[in-house]
Amino acid sequence: DRFYNGDPENDVETREYFYIGDYSSKVTDWNKYPAAMGVREFYGGDLQGVIDKLDYLQDLGVEVLYFNPLFVSPSNHKYDIQDYDYIDPHFGKIVEDGGELLSPGEKSNKKATKYQKRTTSFANLEASNELFIKLVEELHRRGMKIILDGVFNHCGSFNKWMDRECIYERKKGYAPGAYISRESPYHDYFRFFSDEEKDWPYNGKYDGWWGHDTLPKLNYEESVKLENYILNMGRKWVSPPYNVDGWRLDVAADLGRSNEYNHQFWKKFREVVKNANPDAIILAEHYGDPREWLGGDEWDTVMNYDAFMEPITWFLTGMEKHSDEMREELRGNADNFTRAMTYHMANMMVPSLLTSMNELSNHDHSRFLTRTNHMVGRVAELGPEAANEFVNPAVMREAVAFQMTWIGAPTVYYGDEAGVCGFT
């Protein structure tokens, strides 16, 4: 959303819908700092913007694009997926528009008819998938690859399976969501704390990931249909005509309600993905020892927090990766750095190390350049301007030298190449 706006016609509008206590907001000043709670702010970046800037990315030396989620979702981060089958038209193409924005003071998305039209129209959804195909084809023509973000532990409250916001209620081509009706075909996709006829319609008593009602936890163990659907999504996007080159798996160890089921699912996921595209990579977001998933029958590799981002950050800045803590005794401590790297690298076999995602910054943590200012705190406490103060570009360059030469796949968070700063 904050990369490049190639198609202003698909921009999210102010008051297009209501989410987490406020309206969606269209930002017109690209120099404006994002709000501390900026999940509803949209700068207009889209897939056409990426296509327009592929020469720049290729000249920079980029070989693989890893996207945060692109599927239909109400937030700008899109880890609250509304529809796994389609690219969000606000990133793709809006060919069929209409409906009304919410009036000031109106908070019910039942009346967000413009948002409903944009995100449920099959014309918009199919056109957005077609634009995505065009992007992938152009990347492959250039010898580049693409990785998608798979958010399969939970979905969003806007999701057509739950439909807490009544976006899909009585829409042609869509079945009732589990929030709407106990007879919904998606009822078993979720765990309801109160599951009697009297709790419907509009049953909001369901399990959310970490208690967030905007992130309903998916209930795999009680729904073979759900499991098969998500496995099919894993297969679909790495197969023609989409031909994606791999998946990054969000909070992968959290999926399911037991460790036993988690391993069972990822074995099945690997089988369907590799059968469809043997060269597709499967890498997981994971904190801690990943060995039990890296036996060759589940994940290929991980986002390398333990054996790259954290040791490098402590060694060069003395900061915790969220900027939550400063430990002066770890800055420049070569013995601690060597021990940490040696210990955590030993938890991965060589193939996993060679392909591990070595990042300095990403969407979950403060920017590395900001960590060089040694300020402890987050944007809500310190403000966005403080992220730029007292930074040390020389330390950033030193970190990049490590990143580009260390075993693994150097992965640059967009903006780092231009010296962008920012707190968590």
Predicted regions and their residues:
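Active-site-proximal helices and loops of the catalytic beta/alpha 8
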Residues: V136, H140-M144, N153-H154, F158-K198, ...
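Hydrophobic faces of well-ordered beta-strands that scaffold small-molecule active sites
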Residues: D1, L65-F67, I146-L148, W247, ...
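Aromatic/acidic polysaccharide-binding cleft in carbohydrate-active enzymes
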Residues: G295-D306, E359-R378, M404-T424
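A structural motif
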Residues: V62, P241-V244, G408-A409
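Conserved, mostly hydrophobic/aromatic
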Residues: L57, F67, Y84, L139, ...
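N-terminal structural segment of carbohydrate-active enzymes
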Residues: D1-K145, N153-C155, K160, G208-N228
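Short, flexible loop/turn elements at secondary-structure junctions
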Residues: R2, F71, D88-F91, F152, ...
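Active-site clefts of carbohydrate-active enzymes
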Residues: H212-P216, D250-L255, S352-E389
